[in-house]
């Protein structure tokens, strides 16, 4: 069952309210069980092709129906206006190629809202396991960058993260310093990957993925770094990796 609400995020206003998706596991209403929660960026691209920016979603709805995982999935739509998604999903200011220009990094505003407003609301209204051990976050491209940022800077909230094709060319020195300055709690589990057929490998070059994975491991995380042969930088490619990253993030919870 997927519930869709319209919300506004203070400091990240849009002309129209954005969608918040909450996917509840099968038989949620027939039990009193509590569930882990996975938070996802780019919520419009997660469940429905009809909502997706380019007409193709991750197909997460179909995956969850087939996998029957005991999990709540919460996905938040980004700001679709102009280039505002880049602002919301960058932790740092940076200069982008024309016609974008200078980007003001509002990633901290985004994650402060996730952790101090959204998560408490989800925990209050649904039967979650609210502790760090059962709270995860994932995203692709700029959402992958934000997932890494969240896993490190908000490590007290998120114990697991998946970053699919993360945009690592944005302020690489700041990402290195962010990771270097943190000692990550045990457990911290992070999945990171990149495809070999991405349109522009600046966005997630294999070397940058392995360098980031090495730094995360040194900071205390268990890391799975993956190069995906023939995979492009799009939702169809990321959909195929859902079983892999979900198993890595979630498998021990199922077996526990």
Ranges and model annotations:
Residues 1-256:
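Non-catalytic cap/lid and distal C-terminal segments of serine-dependent acyl enzymes
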């Amino acid at each position: 069952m997927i519930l869709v609400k319209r919300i506004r995020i203070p400091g990240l206003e849009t002309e129209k309210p954005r969608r918040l998706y909450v996917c509840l596991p099968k038989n949620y209403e027939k039990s009193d069980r509590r569930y882990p929660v996975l938070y996802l960026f780019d919520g419009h691209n997660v469940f429905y092709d009809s909502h997706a920016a380019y007409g193709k979603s991750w197909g997460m709805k179909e995956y969850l129906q087939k996998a029957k995982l005991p999990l709540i999935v919460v996905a938040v739509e980004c700001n679709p206006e102009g280039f505002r998604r880049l602002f919301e999903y960058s932790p740092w200011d940076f200069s982008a190629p024309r016609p974008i220009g200078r980007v003001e990094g509002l990633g901290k505003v985004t994650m402060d809202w996730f952790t101090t407003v959204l998560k408490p609301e989800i925990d209050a209204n649904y039967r979650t396991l609210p502790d760090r051990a059962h709270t995860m976050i994932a995203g692709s491209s700029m959402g992958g960058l934000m997932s890494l940022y969240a896993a490190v800077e908000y490590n007290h909230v998120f114990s697991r993260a998946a970053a699919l094709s993360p945009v690592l060319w944005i302020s690489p020195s700041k990402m290195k310093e962010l990771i270097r300055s943190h000692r990550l709690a045990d457990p911290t589990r992070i999945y990171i990957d990149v495809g070999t057929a991405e349109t522009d490998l600046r966005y997630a070059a294999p070397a940058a993925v392995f360098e980031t994975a090495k730094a995360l491991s040194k900071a205390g995380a268990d890391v799975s770094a993956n190069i995906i042969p023939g995979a492009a930088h799009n939702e169809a490619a990321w959909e195929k990796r859902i079983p892999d990253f979900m198993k890595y993030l979630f498998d021990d919870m199922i077996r526990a």
